[in-house]
Amino acid sequence: MNLATIGRKLARLTTNAVVSRPWLWRLFRRVTRWQFDAVAPRWETMRLPDTLAPLEAALQGVEPAPRRVLDLGTGTGAAARAIAERFPEAEVVGADLSPRMLGEARRALPQELASRVRYEEADASALPYEDGTFDLVTHQNMIPFFDEVARVVARGGSVLFAFTGGAGTPIYVPPERLREELKRRGFMDFAEFRAGRGNALLARKAARV
């Protein structure tokens, strides 16, 4: 078994454990930051041409156009840049646990997007944002922390989960599990998308309780 295979198995194990028991994240947080810091300099070279396809397909279903967007697990910022290009009036925050990933994201940010996109270090299990701050929260290949997502999304706002390799993505949560967790937290109007090798799920938070 090579290191890549071991890494994928560990990612899947971590995802399954944390989705079921979010408090376990504290056991994985430090090593996760270390892993992504280590690969940050070469992360962009590892991306495949269709990496953003599921995300971009699902973004077409977001209505109305959001004004404030949070991209969790932004990494080197490719998704945040795509979101800013899709919604030219939106302010986009790309948040990530890895300082080195964020450094790469800042270096890759085009000047024409610099006034609308910023990158911040944040732990998705304890986000430093007020309740209802964002109209859209996106995740790509990211362990979801459902309570925090539900807290920071505004009423009537949307959440988007994209997995670039579908069920083969190391960090993956099946659509039926996403629906179950989101319904419990007041989300509705689910829509599924398939593009490239992956899939995405979009849902809207109820405007009223």
Predicted feature descriptions by range:
Residues N2-E63, D123, L160-E181:
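Conserved class I S-adenosyl-L-methionine
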Residues S125-V137:
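A short acidic, Gly/Pro-enriched loop at the edge of an enzyme's catalytic core
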Residues V62-E63, R86, V153:
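A generic alpha-to-beta junction signature in SAM-dependent methyltransferases
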Residues L70-L72, T76-A126:
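Class I SAM-dependent methyltransferase SAM/SAH-binding core
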Residues R194-V209:
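Core SAM-dependent methyltransferase catalytic element
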